[in-house]
Swiss-Prot record:
Highest taxon listed in the record's lineage: Eukaryota
Subunit and partners: Monomer.
Descriptive protein name: Snake venom serine protease ussurin
Main location: secreted
Taxonomic path: Eukaryota, Metazoa, Chordata, Craniata, Vertebrata
Function statement: Snake venom serine protease that may act in the hemostasis system of the prey.
């Protein structure tokens, strides 16, 4: 996260970090939506995913931090056919559920979509500088705004007209999610509204906001899968 500050240790109990058995570094974020399920971006899929819950500082782990592996993964499209612009969402079922604790608690799915102008909080262990990467020990948080989708279409002309995507950032630049924040949550007015998935090569530039999968549009799909209907189809 560019232009943010260290998150309050108590404000991100639902934030998880993804790493692989090979590389110890957190490469993506994710969001705990109940005791057994994590939502992230499809492009965060890897062979040997490890999921860290209840983390704040990597160097000094919380005593209630937990590690899990996924038992099942679900994609809107087969994991490799989502496009750069569309349906970048993955639901992972934990092999063992986690209990709520001081630093672990799920966030609920949104009951309404966010409106343009909403103030939202983006968070993650991604780089805090853009051209050279600097990975922080603790997650950083920044407040950004939901912008009109047309702002993103102006910045990225190849964006499709249909929108299951939120456009969010600061028009004048300076605050943004960045490399390593993908898959993590965008929280607007206390509701989990977006999954970070794409931004310009240099983060936090003026008029180049980030793109976030619009969680609200996928709530039926998510709830169907969680309730056992694994053939549920994604919104078109």
């Amino acid at each position: 996260v560019i232009g943010g500050v260290e998150c309050n240790i108590n404000e991100h109990r639902f934030l998880v970090a993804l790493y692989t058995s090979r590389s110890r570094r957190f490469y993506c974020g994710g969001t705990l939506i109940n005791q057994e399920w994590v939502l992230t971006a499809a492009h965060c899929d890897r062979k040997n995913i490890r999921i860290k819950l209840g983390m704040h500082s990597e160097k000094v782990p919380n005593e209630d931090a937990q590690t899990r592996v996924p038992k099942e993964k679900f994609f809107c499209l087969s994991s490799k056919t989502y496009t750069k612009w569309d349906k970048d969402i993955m639901l992972m079922r934990l092999k063992r559920p986690v209990n709520n604790s001081t630093h672990i608690a799920p966030v609920s799915l949104p009951s309404n979509p966010p409106s343009v102008g909403s103030v939202c909080r983006v968070m993650g262990w991604g780089t805090i500088t853009s051209s050279q990467e600097t990975h922080p020990d603790v997650p950083h948080c920044a407040n950004i705004n939901i912008l009109d989708y047309e702002v993103c279409r102006a910045a990225y002309p190849e964006l499709p007209v249909t929108r299951r995507t939120l456009c969010a950032g600061i028009l004048e630049g300076g605050k943004d999610s960045c490399n390593g924040d993908s898959g993590g949550p965008l929280i607007c007015n206390g509701q989990f509204q977006g999954i970070a998935y794409w931004g310009a090569d240099t983060c936090a530039q003026p008029r180049e906001p980030g793109l976030y999968t619009k969680v609200f549009d996928y709530t039926d799909w998510i709830q169907s899968i969680i309730s056992g209907n694994t053939d549920a189809t994604c919104p078109q």
